Amino acid sequence: MSWSILEFLRKNPEELKNNLKRRAIDVSLVDKAVELDKKWRQVLQEVERLRHQHNVLSSQIPKLSGEERKKKIEESKNLLKILEDKEKELEKIEVERDRLLSTLPNLVADDVPNGPDDSYNIPIKFWGKFKVYEGDVEEFLRQTKDANVNYEIIKWKPKGHAEMLEDVLHLGNTLKAAEIAGSRFYYLFNDIVWLDFALLLFAIDYITQQGYTLVLPPYMLRGEVIQSVIDLDTFKDAIYKIENEDLYLIATAEHSIAAMFFKEEIEKDKLPLKFAGISPAFRKEAGAANKDLKGIFRVHQFHKVEQFIFSTPEDSWKYHAELITNAESIFQQLELPYRIVNIASGDLGACAAKKFDLEVWMPAQAKFREMVSCSNCTDWQAFRMKIRYVDRKNNKRGYVHTLNSTAIASTRTITAILENYQREDGVVEVPKVLRKYLEIFPKAPKDYIYPLKNKII
């Protein structure tokens, strides 16, 4: 089975153009790719004809003798030279065609909302009881229109997570971190650090109980690999490159896990392969220059647990639903109220055919903020990484489908806890589901996180 985009290119290029239009991308790329593929197939026919001629000629030579034999040998050598030149031409065209095709984003799923940006994203589900400050009720109802959500009005204004972290609890310091490392770095202390690790332990405990294999992956990848996993031309300003090395720091364990079978074949009867990766995540956040400058919501480094699945094409949508269900279960157990959003075509990113975001309500900000991104990348990554499945029973090969979803991004989830679990006196309740991961440590918080009287630094 060939790559889905290549199939569309040959069978229905207009549909491929429509897909690019849904993403607001120049459709002339399709015309260029069609011409290259047409040329490739023409040269392929010539190569196959020359191979056949050479094989026929080679089979005749042993039966000949004398001058006729010498003549056929010379003819065979000349034909072989022509064949080798044509094969090089074929390879060159194929590389050029595949390079162009690799710049194309994934095919957008039919049920993805059309629209150029995130204002066209569609909320499809709400869960939990939402705490809403009395001055924000109108804004909350605007964001949850016609959803019939359950909410309670509170009379005191919750403090933002940045203020809670640094000025109330005195358990974080971003100013000092900025002095020594730059903006979007942080120092976290004591109870917040315990909370970070409790979230990670909870996530890997839950996900592995669902049958996922726990993996600690490489934190760096070679350039050839990372540009197969992501659209590096678009995201080169979002990820860190090691100076004078062909190595990039990963932005998520998804990158390393996706490359686990780089240029390999997987037996079909071994699919699906499900992994839970835990790693730091390193991000430049270059495109977010003026967003979330305070606090730890949008930072250059954080800890993350990632879900990842290698699937057969026919089962990938089933597993996409499984991934978001797992993520929902985690946030339901944390009792953090959220909504699920179906991401619009122009906001998808190149890899994904469809993406759900899980966004938690932040009462201090009076808005929903992204905590989880859950994508079906179908065969987009697999084609670029040359990861195929083998069905020996039916003598078939095809590209696997790859899927990924956040389980927990630690710092973002901490911001949600600080805003949703704070009391008016500044005390923060520890979510009940996390307490068993903290009770084994004498110095860890058990039920509540209390403000310190003095700053640590």
From Swiss-Prot:
Superkingdom as given in the UniProt entry: Archaea
UniProt EC number: 6.1.1.11
Pathway the protein takes part in: Aminoacyl-tRNA biosynthesis; selenocysteinyl-tRNA(Sec) biosynthesis; L-seryl-tRNA(Sec) from L-serine and tRNA(Sec): step 1/1
Enzymatic reactions: tRNA(Ser) + L-serine + ATP = L-seryl-tRNA(Ser) + AMP + diphosphate + H(+); tRNA(Sec) + L-serine + ATP = L-seryl-tRNA(Sec) + AMP + diphosphate + H(+)
CC terms in the record's Gene Ontology section: cytoplasm
Subcellular location: Cytoplasm
GO MF: ATP binding; serine-tRNA ligase activity
Predominant localisation class: cytoplasm
Swiss-Prot/TrEMBL keywords: Aminoacyl-tRNA synthetase, ATP-binding, Cytoplasm, Ligase, Nucleotide-binding, Protein biosynthesis
Main EC class the enzyme belongs to: ligase
Disulfide bond entries: none
GO biological process: selenocysteine biosynthetic process; seryl-tRNA aminoacylation
Binding positions for L-serine per the UniProt entry: T252, A253, E254, E306, T406
Residue positions binding ATP: R283, K284, E285, V299, E370, M371, V372, S373
Record text on subunit structure and interactions: Homodimer. The tRNA molecule binds across the dimer.
Family: Belongs to the class-II aminoacyl-tRNA synthetase family. Type-1 seryl-tRNA synthetase subfamily.
Comment on protein domains: Consists of two distinct domains, a catalytic core and a N-terminal extension that is involved in tRNA binding.
Protein name: Serine--tRNA ligase
Species for this entry: Saccharolobus islandicus (strain Y.G.57.14 / Yellowstone #1)
Lineage summary: Archaea, Thermoproteota, Thermoprotei, Sulfolobales, Sulfolobaceae
